[in-house]
């Protein structure tokens, strides 16, 4: 929910190897006084969660996600460490790394590689459609129950009522224009997002790139929000037309 108020700083982060960075995360962060009261987006929580899962399953994050999510869903084109870089579109022309293609843009995930719980997934619209359908089917896909129905219901409830804005578990919220019921929403740093409306059985998968060839963050965010507002407005209008007699 990004309300742990994680406090910490890792100097020379990008110069460390994977084990050094993992040790630094495990010993450099602690919860602050505003825990549960303020939403501050940080990927430190998902990185630490990844380390916890590795301890529980005694596998790397890539192995955990591949065996329990990607392969059972049939997301055969999705991976964290692509072997054929030409299958991946360029991400950014970076000052230090040159043209980033087929390796994660995120500097922490770039160092952590198979141990990263915060970033680095390469996918396409066909595979992401399978992932989204699992959510729309309340956790089920092709007779395999990935998430309990109760878990999907739980995701649609504000998990931090004492905080300054609502959040779900791992997801942000957007809201239906007419009813103000919550929709699951998540963005990726490079310009992607997912918007899932479980009740209306619809979703918006947006695959774009805001950092290549140039990064115009503010312009992108403004235009993205306009696109979302238009989509939600038109979606609500279509729904009203379909339900009116």
Give residue ranges: language-model regions:
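Short intrinsically disordered coil segments
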Residues: 186-189, 222-223
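Short, well-ordered beta-strand elements
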Residues: 201-210, 214
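Short, surface-exposed loop or secondary-structure junction motifs
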Residues: 1-184
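Active-site-proximal beta-strand/loop segments in catalytic clefts of secreted hydrolases
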Residues: 1, 187-188, 207-209
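Short, surface-exposed beta-strand/loop micro-motifs that present aromatic residues
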Residues: 183, 190-203
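Short, gly/Ser/Thr-rich active-site loops of penicillin-recognizing serine hydrolases
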Residues: 137, 141, 151, 156-159, ...
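Short Gly/Pro-enriched loop/turn and capping motifs at secondary-structure junctions
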Residues: 176-178, 190-192, 210-212
């Amino acid at each position: 929910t990004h309300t742990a108020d994680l406090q910490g700083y890792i100097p020379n982060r990008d110069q460390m190897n994977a084990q050094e960075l993992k040790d630094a995360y495990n010993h450099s962060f602690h919860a602050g006084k505003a825990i549960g009261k303020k939403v501050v987006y940080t990927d430190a929580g998902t990185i630490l969660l990844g380390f916890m899962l590795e301890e529980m399953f005694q596998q790397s994050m890539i192995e955990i996600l591949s065996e329990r999510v990607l392969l059972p869903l049939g997301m055969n084109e999705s991976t964290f460490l692509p072997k054929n870089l030409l299958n991946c579109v360029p991400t950014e022309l970076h000052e230090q790394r040159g043209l980033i293609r087929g390796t994660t843009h995120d500097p922490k995930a770039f160092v952590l590689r198979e141990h990263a719980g915060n970033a680095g997934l390469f996918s396409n619209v066909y595979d992401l459609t399978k992932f989204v359908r699992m959510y729309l089917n309340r956790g089920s896909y092709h007779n395999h129950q990935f998430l309990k129905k109760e878990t999907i219901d739980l995701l649609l409830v504000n998990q931090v009522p004492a905080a300054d804005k609502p959040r779900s578990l791992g997801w942000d919220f957007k809201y239906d224009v007419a009813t103000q019921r919550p929709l699951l929403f998540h963005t990726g740093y490079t310009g992607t997002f997912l918007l899932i409306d479980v009740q209306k059985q619809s979703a918006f998968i947006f695959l774009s790139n805001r950092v290549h060839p140039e990064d115009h963050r503010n312009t992108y965010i403004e235009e993205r929000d306009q696109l979302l507002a238009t989509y939600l407005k038109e979606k609500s209008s279509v729904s009203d037309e379909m339900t009116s007699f």
